Amino acid sequence: MKTITIKVKRLHSKAMLPAYMSPHAAGMDLYACPDGEVVVKPGCRTIVPTGIALAIPVGYEGQVRPRSGLALHHGVTLVNTPGTIDADYRGELGIIIINHGDEDFVVSPGDRIAQLVIAPVHRAVLETVEELDETDRNEGGFGHTGF
């Protein structure tokens, strides 16, 4: 397994560093660092601060993903998933969560609220053409293979 170094800056004295929770985990858990409890009403969304900023190396991105346990047990997930952290972003990581559940969801400082996966980035060079190669699928879109 390849490793890279990512610089982390604590923006708040109580900020917790992302952490892998098992030896082969692909994602590091991200921790909430609000000033106090944050209550997210059913159907509502909010941004939860993490208290950290990252310097992701050029050639990589951070993908912020939901935690499956929060989705299963509370109906809480991320609004934009995966969220992308570019290599040139240096601000605080904020996690935009939404409560699809039926009850208030309370986020407390130190709660694990999302996962961070580091992935390589490949930049595309676009080539304008008059025609595209034919495929068996061609323009078949949403649900074209059945439900």
Curated annotation (Swiss-Prot):
A GO MF term: magnesium ion binding
Species name: Syntrophotalea carbinolica (strain DSM 2380 / NBRC 103641 / GraBd1)
Family designation: Belongs to the dUTPase family.
InterPro entries linked: dUTPase (IPR008181), dUTPase-like (IPR029054), dUTPase-like_sf (IPR036157), dUTPase_trimeric (IPR033704)
Keyword Hydrolase: yes
Biological role: This enzyme is involved in nucleotide metabolism: it produces dUMP, the immediate precursor of thymidine nucleotides and it decreases the intracellular concentration of dUTP so that uracil cannot be incorporated into DNA.
Taxonomic lineage from the root: Bacteria, Pseudomonadati, Thermodesulfobacteriota, Desulfuromonadia, Desulfuromonadales
Names of the cofactor(s): Mg(2+)
Name of the protein this chain belongs to: Deoxyuridine 5'-triphosphate nucleotidohydrolase
Catalyzed reactions: dUTP + H2O = dUMP + diphosphate + H(+)
Pathway: Pyrimidine metabolism; dUMP biosynthesis; dUMP from dCTP (dUTP route): step 2/2
Entry keyword set: Hydrolase, Magnesium, Metal-binding, Nucleotide metabolism
Residue ranges crossing the lipid bilayer per the database entry: none
Binding annotation for substrate: 67-69, 80, 84-86
